[in-house]
Amino acid sequence: MSSQQIVFLIVNAIGGIAVLGSYAIGLGMFPEYREALWGEVRGTLRTGITISMLFAALGYLSFCYVALFQNGLSDFNKVNWFNQYTVSVLIAIFLISATFWMPTAIAYLNFSNTYWLVVCILSLWVTAISLVAILGITITADLESIGSISHYVAIIGIGLITFHCLVFDAIIWAIMFTK
């Protein structure tokens, strides 16, 4: 296993635990806010967002599979913004910012302080922008190490989570939460 793959795995393991942990702790310690965390998102829109969450998670896992097991990291990291760890750095930014959403949303609901709302929405935008960067890198990657099918799987996978985080979280949820 290459150093790129090891760093990628560590970032995803620690970051994934942090994101899921923030959700578990937030919902476990503040069950009274479960409904309020949806804001004004109701009915069909809520169902659609929930279904999109599942596709986004599967898409991200598909991207990770290509990155780790189809030599995608070697092609994706040729962008060289952060040496050979560009994708891992962007994923760290994505996961760190995603970890902030639940606690800042709960802090806003608990204290009604606009500061928490700003940090909450900013965390959603940082999450979305980092995913847009990863999507751009994935789309423009050379196909030296991976085949076209793996490349398209990675694009569709990261595209699904990017769409969800940008459209449903950073735009729609932010508008509906602050109504």
Language model feature labels by segment:
Residues I25-G26, L58-L73, V132-T138:
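Membrane-water interface of transmembrane alpha-helices
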Residues I129-K179:
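Terminal transmembrane helical module of multi-pass membrane proteins
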Residues M1-Q4, M29-L45, A105-V118, L143-I146, ...:
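Membrane-interface interhelical loops and short amphipathic "cap" helices
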Residues R42-L61:
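Interfacial helix-start motif at the membrane-water boundary
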Residues G15-P31, V167-D169:
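Alpha-helical transmembrane segments of multi-pass membrane proteins
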Residues M1-G15, T47, Q84-Y85, S145-G159:
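Alpha-helical transmembrane segments and their helix-start/interface "positive-inside/aromatic belt" motifs
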Residues G72-L131:
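Membrane-proximal helix-loop-helix units in multi-pass membrane proteins
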